[in-house]
A protein has these predicted regions:
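Feature marks hydrolase-like catalytic cores characterized by long aromatic- and Gly/Pro-rich stretches
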Residues: 45, 157-159, 184
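Glycoside hydrolase catalytic-domain groove-lining segments
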Residues: 63-94, 102-180
Length: 184
């Protein structure tokens, strides 16, 4: 599986020199290039990653977030999925997010109403703030099965060290004082 074709956190800095129309054009051309180049080898793609947070992401300025603010979440997803589907009509296309709140459900519903060709719902089950357990796992599956699409757990983290405290909202902001991974 290819992961991801579009993501605000790994966006090339040099894109910032362009206007939003040019940025989108370059993103879509890259999707077309990569999906075509790997057809037959990679036929399953996380098309766009973590869109729930994308237009409000303010940790740093980046081109993908800027375009998403312009197009809106569903508009951005529709553009990227259309490019991926045109490049390989037989590919399995996933929408992927770590956010399992009602916001993701609303986003998926909006995409399906806009005829975005989502084949699979991707759910990240990072457990940085605690073990999910069967109860939460079943709860998440129950909520997202209502869309009638297969569900893939696309990313999963089991923490072997300190859990991230509950008050930390942006998980990448948490730093442990030391890494107890070596005996010395």
């Amino acid at each position: 599986k290819g992961h991801p074709l579009c993501w605000h956190t790994v966006c090339a800095d040099w894109l910032m020199q362009y206007d939003n129309k040019t940025i989108l054009d370059k993103i879509l051309k890259r999707i077309d290039r990569d999906v075509k180049a790997f057809t037959g080898t990679i036929d399953m793609w996380d098309v766009i990653n973590e869109v729930v947070i994308m237009p409000i992401f303010d940790k740093y300025d980046n081109a993908v977030t800027r375009v998403c603010k312009d197009l809106g979440r569903v508009g951005m997803i529709k553009e990227t999925f259309a490019a991926a589907k045109a490049a390989n009509p037989d590919a399995t296309l996933l929408l992927n997010d770590f956010n399992t709140s009602i916001s993701y459900e609303i986003l998926i519903d909006g995409c399906l109403q806009a005829d975005v060709p989502i084949d699979v719902i991707g759910i990240q089950s990072h457990q940085h703030q605690g073990y999910w357990g069967a109860e939460k796992l079943y709860q998440v599956l129950e909520r997202f099965e209502s869309f009638g699409k297969p569900i893939h757990f696309t990313e999963n983290t089991f923490v072997s060290g300190d859990l991230i405290p509950a008050h930390i909202v942006v998980l990448n902001d948490f730093l442990v004082p030391e890494w107890p991974s070596t005996p010395e």
